[in-house]
């Protein structure tokens, strides 16, 4: 009777707690120095081949930009980031790929939670390449949180805005704490989140609500970029 009871309890544990028996791979770890760029064609789902493997030294050798970014979060607050690295389009060119041939960009990260191909984020190429995005240095003190995925720039929020390129940051620092966001500076950058996508916010209108959540697209721990090309 006792043996049957123990066997039953063990069966319940296996059914209800598979992670105890078959643990999943741990994610959210530093990605490493090498960036793997793979390419595939539209309509060939999941079929990607390695085009280039770029070392940290190769990425450092590309023209560098140090930029500041402000992005709205999913809870309607503002995240501030400072990052240094090459422009994303330069990284793609360094891999021997014509920017004009790229339809979709997929970021592979160790923070992907086990998704297919470790994709954290995928987007149309023209969203961050060739588009105009902005940094708003005065938005922290002039921003109204309206709810989840909703906020509004107040008077003065758009003053001093500047266009920023999308970069693949080798070193960066970000914060969602308003008091820290106002004091953010380049000396705070480190490589803990590398490689990280840093992109600006879309064009905002003073006094007009926006639901453009861009902070969750600031992927970190990127170890690979998959590019879906036009054609076949």
Residue ranges and their predicted role:
Residues 1-4:
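Positively charged n-region of N-terminal signal peptides that target proteins for export
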Residues 24-232:
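N-terminal intrinsically disordered, low-complexity segments enriched in P/E/S/T
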């Amino acid at each position: 009777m006792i043996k049957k009871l123990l066997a039953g309890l063990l069966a319940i544990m296996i059914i209800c707690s598979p992670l105890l028996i078959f643990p999943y791979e741990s994610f959210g770890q530093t990605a490493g120095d090498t960036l793997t760029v793979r390419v595939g064609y539209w309509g060939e789902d999941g079929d990607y081949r390695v085009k280039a493997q770029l070392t940290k030294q190769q990425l450092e050798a590309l023209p560098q930009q140090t930029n500041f970014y402000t992005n709205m979060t999913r809870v309607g607050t503002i995240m501030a980031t400072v990052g240094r690295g090459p422009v994303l389009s330069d990284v793609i060119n360094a891999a021997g790929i014509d920017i004009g041939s790229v339809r979709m960009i997929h970021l592979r990260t160790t923070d992907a939670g086990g998704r297919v191909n470790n994709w954290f984020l995928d987007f149309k190429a023209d969203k961050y390449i060739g588009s105009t995005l902005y940094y708003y240095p005065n938005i922290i003190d002039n921003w109204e949180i309206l709810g989840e995925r909703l906020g509004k720039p107040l008077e003065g929020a758009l003053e001093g805005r500047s266009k920023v390129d999308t970069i693949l940051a080798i070193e960066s620092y970000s914060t969602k704490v308003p008091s820290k966001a106002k004091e953010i500076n380049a000396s705070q950058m480190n490589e803990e989140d590398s490689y990280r996508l840093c992109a600006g916010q879309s064009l905002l209108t003073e006094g007009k609500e926006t639901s453009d959540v861009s902070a969750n697209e600031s992927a970190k721990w990127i170890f690979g970029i998959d590019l879906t090309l036009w054609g076949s």
